[in-house]
């Protein structure tokens, strides 16, 4: 069983809200505990969060809002999640830095990859906020881009309500089966929607592995980081 030295953890915005609009403190506290366990195990970790518990640009666009403006609103929602997670991590004694793609000098550092790497080398958690800082990019793609630029060994995609990648939506199709292993080419060819296809393609081109797993039970993040085989491992093949 082999572990990782530096990981990028992708968390959905819906997870922060516990299925509702806003931030659920109990959920964020649980996630912070899990991340603290990873840090205490000596693993370097960076995090990208979504903002779907506040805004989704594509959905607001369908209701008539300008997509660019809606996406920027989503980026601000992501920063709120970052600050909430930072607060709970620091209450646990974990040094944390938030870096944002849009300058917000009073609450976060600007996104500087070399500084992010240095923070992780010092044992700090780095939380990347405000997406890519540009509209039309999903946080899935941002997670992969940040992982590549900060030289992470793997992208860990933590999911709520599903424990890996399936042939179809297991909540809708009782015949759906879970993949233990998968290649990016297969994921793209099958049209699997666990992450967007741009993220899959970017990982595949750069041979960056991804593990898709469920957040439950508590402790799964540490298990994955330490090399335990849970969820689905996606590789370039």
Swiss-Prot record:
Pathway: Pyrimidine metabolism; CTP biosynthesis via de novo pathway; UDP from UMP (UMPK route): step 1/1. GO terms for molecular function: ATP binding; UMP kinase activity. The keyword Nucleotide-binding applies. ATP binds at residues 10-13, 52, 56, 160, 166, 169. UMP binds at residues 51, 71, 132-139. Its main location: cytoplasm. InterPro entries: AceGlu_kinase-like_sf, Asp/Glu/Uridylate_kinase, Uridylate_kinase, Uridylate_kinase_bac. Its EC number is 2.7.4.22. It is found in: Cytoplasm. Keywords: ATP-binding, Cytoplasm, Kinase, Nucleotide-binding, Pyrimidine biosynthesis, Transferase. Homohexamer. This is Uridylate kinase. It comes from Nocardioides sp. (strain ATCC BAA-499 / JS614). The gene is pyrH.
């Amino acid at each position: 069983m082999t572990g990782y030295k530096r990981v990028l953890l992708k968390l959905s915005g819906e997870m922060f809200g516990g299925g509702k609009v806003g931030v659920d403190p109990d959920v964020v506290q649980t996630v912070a505990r899990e991340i603290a366990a990873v840090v205490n195990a000596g693993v370097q970790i960076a995090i990208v969060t979504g903002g779907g518990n506040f805004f989704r640009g594509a959905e607001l666009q369908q209701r008539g809002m300008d997509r660019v403006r809606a996406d920027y609103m989503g980026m601000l929602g992501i920063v709120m999640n970052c600050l909430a997670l930072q607060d709970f991590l620091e209450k646990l004694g974990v040094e944390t830095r938030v870096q944002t793609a849009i300058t917000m000098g009073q609450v976060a550092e600007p996104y500087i990859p070399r500084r992010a790497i240095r923070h992780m080398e010092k044992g700090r958690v780095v939380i990347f906020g405000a997406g890519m800082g540009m509209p039309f990019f999903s946080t899935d793609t941002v997670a992969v881009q940040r992982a590549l630029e900060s030289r992470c060994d793997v992208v860990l995609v933590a999911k709520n309500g599903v424990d890996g990648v399936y042939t179809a939506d297991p909540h809708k199709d009782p015949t759906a089966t879970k993949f233990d292993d998968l290649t990016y080419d297969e994921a793209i060819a099958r049209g699997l929607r666990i992450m967007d296809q741009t993220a899959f393609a970017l990982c595949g081109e750069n041979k960056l592995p991804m593990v898709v797993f469920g957040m439950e039970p508590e402790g799964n993040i540490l298990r994955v980081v330490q090399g335990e085989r849970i969820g689905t491992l996606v590789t370039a093949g």
